[in-house]
Amino acid sequence: MSLRSNKAGFGYEVQRKMEANYDREEAQGTPRQIITWIIEVMASDDGKFEKPTEELLDWKSLCTYLRDGVVLCKFLNILLLKDNKSKVTFSKKVSNSFAAMTNIENFNKGCEAYGLAREFSFQSGDLWEVRKGPFYNVINCLHSLGFVANSKAFIPAYAGEVTKYMDRD
């Protein structure tokens, strides 16, 4: 959003910290492991999945790829069906931000139904606004979802590693 003013004071410190957290996860390879897992899971669904047309090498391209919530909902529906749970509903053709926000909200509700704790979910704006700091919340959600899937012996397994950081700020 080009009309957004720059953060100052406490807001700036929070944004800086979230961006640093994302950078740390990126250095660990977490976003790459997440997108690899998503593609493997979706490709395992009888070949109905079209791989992304571009390399998802940076946070912005990954965020844009997931932005409308369609890929997230399709991905989650595969997890839910293998766990004998109801699929989430979503709009396949997103023509406005309201449909995207609804998709993202349905994804979060589906994650809770799958067994992910509510505190690991993210706000729809974290994904929709395509900003690096808030995108960390999306990565954290998907990373945690991977561990929930692993605890249910879902195949293909998520290869992410548990990382523990001491927050000193």
Residue ranges and their predicted role:
Residues 1-169:
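Alpha-helical coiled-coil scaffolding segments
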